[in-house]
């Protein structure tokens, strides 16, 4: 009976941890692109409860990318649909982005009150989007490193390990001429030769 109780208790703890697991992950708008194409990377948080504590109030992240394959274009803060979930009351937020070689550091601190963040913030949303341009052929690997992340009061949140992803950059494809165009070209050359035979210079 005691073993059964311990087993049930262990399952309860396991499911409880899974239920309240908070994740920050990378998502790309494409997995294959050509030189000159633009890639959009989104960094998303999930696992928070809608309109309830804990909410997200501050984060400090490093985004790793291959600087030989991609050049940084822009950083867009917030969710394109839900808006910036760290600026719910319109007071703004402290935002900083710094590039150091193949690392992009992104920091944001909300100026909203604890009550506004806990009561108004969504459970799943995009923190920011990064736009990059492909500039060389190869496989680009992206990684995310969490320096720190805190709730509305600044207390540290427990976060699962972020995912990584890879994107393939290929060369620009040159379209091959269609069979119909090749046939027209051959007919034109044949007609020109026949004409030269009929009307020699």
Segment roles from a protein language model:
Residues 29, 33-89:
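Low-complexity, serine/threonine/proline/glycine-rich extracellular segments that form mucin-like
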Residues 175-194:
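A short, hydrophobic C-terminal helix/tail in secreted or cell-surface proteins
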């Amino acid at each position: 009976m005691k073993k059964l109780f311990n087993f049930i208790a262990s399952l309860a703890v396991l499911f409880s941890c899974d239920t309240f697991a908070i994740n920050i992950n990378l998502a790309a708008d494409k997995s294959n692109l050509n030189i000159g194409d633009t890639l959009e990377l989104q960094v998303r948080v999930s696992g928070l409860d809608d309109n309830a504590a804990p909410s997200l109030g501050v984060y400090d992240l490093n985004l790793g990318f291959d600087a030989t394959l991609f050049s940084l274009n822009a950083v867009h803060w917030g969710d394109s649909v839900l808006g910036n979930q760290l600026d719910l009351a319109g007071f703004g937020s402290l935002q900083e982005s710094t590039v150091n070689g193949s690392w992009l550091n992104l920091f944001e601190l909300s100026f909203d009150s604890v009550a506004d963040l806990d009561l108004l913030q969504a459970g799943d949303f995009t923190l920011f989007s990064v736009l990059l341009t492909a500039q060389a052929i190869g496989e680009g690997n992206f990684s995310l490193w969490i320096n720190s992340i805190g709730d509305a009061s600044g207390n540290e949140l427990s976060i699962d390990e972020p995912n990584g992803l890879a994107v393939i950059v290929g060369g620009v494809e040159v379209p091959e001429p269609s069979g119909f165009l090749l046939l027209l070209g051959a007919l034109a050359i044949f007609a020109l030769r026949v004409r030269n035979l009929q009307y020699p210079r």
